[in-house]
Structures are given as structure tokens and as C-alpha cells.
Amino acid sequence: MHFGVNLSFTVKRWVEPEIWAKLVQEQLGLSLVQFTYDLLDPWWPESLRNTMASRVRKAAQTWGIEIESAFSGLANYCFDGLLHPEAEGRRASLEWWKRAFDVAAAVGASASGGPLGGMSVADSQDPKRRQQRYNDLLDAVAELTESAKAAGLQRIQVECTPLAREIPYTVSQSQQFLKDLEGRCAIPVKLLVDIGHALYQPLYGPNARMPEWLNGLGRSIGAFHLQNTDFQSDSHWGWPDSRGLFDVARFADEVKKAGLEDVPAFLEIIYPFELADEVVLKSITTSVMHCRREYAGETTQEMQLA
């Protein structure tokens, strides 16, 4: 089982590469991370981007950390992205992603991605406009695979989200999305499945279960996001948390049964910005240890030696 951490917990706290790299290795005992663009904005001037990316890459190498991929983060998710109602908005998102791929390659990642965008209510409710947004999205992703390949990346990862105005948001839509991209992409397009999204009961119902996603998407899945959740919100809590109900060990068994043990899983906890730093550090540490034990199957001795 390949387990690592998304660097979302470092945002607005341990932003210096030399500091978070040391923390990940020494405090958390991990050597696999997913970088977030909340730490390095692709819109920054090229000189600043290059300088910061070089620091990130050097820090990761110094501390023996693999940056498996770079992900969009919270800031970019606030915008409508590649599904913006205005053509100029969609073009701006396209440019953002192209810059993001350059950043991903510069920090040493082999993949990049995230949620692709969200339709406005008006576009979503109009069948003709909804179909046009979908067609535009396919064109955009195909173009982005060319840019990602040129940057040196090996694949793009699209995150499935629990909103009907975003694409893709169901297993069947994910399957159709990938089918519609066949023969159009310069590099593979994979899916990232977040357990808190896939098990969101207000959208998918009380019987939502992970095997539906694992068996339905199979090798199309390029990564997982782990979080603790009550299944009523996209919670992104850690462990222990009395509100959380997610069984990490059970999920590990489901992943093994689906034959997806080699797919990396990243713990993604999103903390309130105002939460005390020492509280965040304690929480991310106990959460990582919980997942190392329950998901990765590490023994207490192995965790102490790491």
C-alpha cells in the first residue's frame, strides 16, 4: 500500500519547503507527498515560480521525499475553472493549468490535476448549454494533455467531486468522460477518488459504498484522497475525531480486493486557518499514524523506526 500526505495541512503555516519537508520526514515519518498549488501559485511571475519550485525540489531531495503529483488546492477550487460560463473565464483557467503543469514538472512531480471546474446554475439547468460546457471541457482536457506532456508530466489526474454541476461526479459519468476522451489525449487521464466525495450521502444516498467506485473505475483510478467524514459533508477531518465515521482499515481491505494496492493514497485534511498551529501539528501527526497503521498496515515497531 502506498500512503502519503497532501500538503494541504501546511498552507498558511509551514510554507517554507525546507520546513515542511523536514516535518513530513521527521514528524510524520513519510516519504511520499502530494504538492498543492496553495503553496506556489501558478499565476506568480515566472522568476518567482522558478525560484520557489527549485527550493521545493531541493528540499524534497534533501529529505528523501517523493513528490508524486501536484494538486490544485483550495484557492483554485473557488473558481468555475474550465466550466466557467464565459469563454474568457474558461481560457483563463486553461492558462492557469498550463502554468500549473510547468510548476509540477519543476518541483519534480510526474502528474498534476484536481477538480476541473463547476457550471453555473443557469448553464447546468439549460440542456443545450450544459452539453456545450461538456464538449468544451473535453476539448480543454485534450489540449491540456498536450501541454502536460510538453512540460514533462506523465499523466493528468481529474478529481471526482460530489456536485452535480461539476464533471465528473458519478461512476457512470466518469466512465463516459474517459470514453469520450479516448484517442484525443497525448498522455493518460486518470481519476482521483476522494472517499469523502464518493460516500457523500446527501447526493449518493445512504447505501453509498466504496466498492462501487473501486470496481466501476478500476485501473482508471490514479490516486485516492483519505479523510475522516460523517458522510454528510465533505468533512476532511482527521483522527481521532468523535464526529468521523470512516473506517480506514475496511477501505484498505476494499482496495486490496479491487487489486488497487499500488494506487497511491494521500491523507488530505483541511484545517480552519484560525486553528492553533500546535493543534494542527498534533492532529496531522495522530491522523498520519492512524492511517499508517490502519491503511498501510504498519506495525508499531515499523512506525517507530521510520
Question: What are these model-predicted stretches?
Answer:
Residues T62, D80-K190:
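Active-site acidic/histidine proton-transfer and metal-coordination neighborhood
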Residues M1-L7, V11-G29, S54, G108, ...:
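Histidine-acidic metal/acid-base catalytic patches
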Residues W44-G64:
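Aromatic-lined substrate-binding rim segments of carbohydrate-active enzymes
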Residues S31-P42:
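A short beta-strand-loop structural module common to alpha/beta enzyme folds
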